[in-house]
Amino acid sequence: MFFNRKNTNLFFKFTLLFLFLFLLKIIPFNTGFEDSIDYLNNISFTISSHFKLNKDNKLKFKSSSSCLNDTLNKYKSHLNFINSHNKAIKAKNDFIKLSDEEISSYSMLSYNEKISLLNNTNYSLEDRIHIFLGSDLENFSLVYYNISTKEKVSINENKEFKPASTYKLGLNALIYNLSLNGKLNLNDTITFENCDYEDGTGLLCSKSSIGTYTIQELLDLSIIYSDNIASNMLTRYLGGRDEVKKELYSLLNINYPYSKSTITADIEYRILMYIYDNKNLPEFNHLIEVLTKTEFHDRLDKYIPQEIVAHKIGSNESYIHDVGIIFSDSPYILVIYTNGIAYPDEKIAQISKAIYNNYN
């Protein structure tokens, strides 16, 4: 037989030599050493993604010609793929555009491979998130806005979600605006009524007697501990949730029915932008400070420095959200809303980490 052990080893040596020459041919020599390494890493990832080459894939030889032809055909096919992608690799901030078919093909990647691709900046953030989430994308909404560069990425930004506790962020923004305009005093007090009671997050629900608190105290409780009762007391004081949203949307020029019990990522982005724009005012500076002191750290700030993340989570059954301002060297706003996706906390955390690492 031609393919005895000795000849098989020779064949593999020939294949490795062929692959080495193949790589030499396609790597652009006008790039620096680090760029070449990045280029090789990208090729390596693409090969492993498309052909699933690993230790368990072993070629079974029937004849020298059939084996060689199979191998050459695979590399020829992949060479065509790489050549087309080479044309798309441009200057920084340009991306390889993936077709719907290519995005669909990446659905077969393992979770760890999807994490690697999520951090691969050769591809657009939209495509990377699409591949990472797969079919969960339809129940996901995101707005990323870089305040320094003005870059904005939106995914399903007008899709409606129950706001859960992200409602409390707009409530705080409105009350601080009313205080600045002399329409209320943050030292005014509100006394608990039975209609304010709500179980869940917060400190007040565990007290045998709740009593009276200043508006400022209730605001801080509603953010740091996501206190439902504190939020309800403030909302009642202002005339109810519809009245709060009516005033807030009027303030921000938002054209959205305030009677709806839903919100969109675009609306939350505008609320955060308003807070950031007023960050130098004492009231809003304080709001940003308490947003960095929230007790919840399993989403936006799970893998990035907590002290730079001014954020508010929201959780209501299948609705899992996190929204905030990240005060990195290049500050940005990140809004993520989800409904019924698998492992939402971790997916929000991984997307947040990828954006922080790739854009700052």
Name each model-derived stretch.
Residues 2-130, 134-136, 152, 242, ...:
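Structured C-terminal helix/loop/strand segments within mature extracytoplasmic catalytic/sensor domains
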Residues 138-160:
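Short, conserved catalytic-motif segment at the N-terminal edge
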Residues 145-147, 195, 222-226, 237-238, ...:
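Active-site-proximal beta-strand/loop segments in catalytic clefts of secreted hydrolases
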Residues 150, 161-190, 222, 334:
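Active-site SXXK
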Residues 173-181, 270-277, 356-357:
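Short glycine/serine- and small hydrophobic-enriched flexible loop segments
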Residues 177-196, 242, 281-285:
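Short, well-structured active-site flanking segments
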Residues 291-313:
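Short Gly/Thr-rich strand-loop-strand
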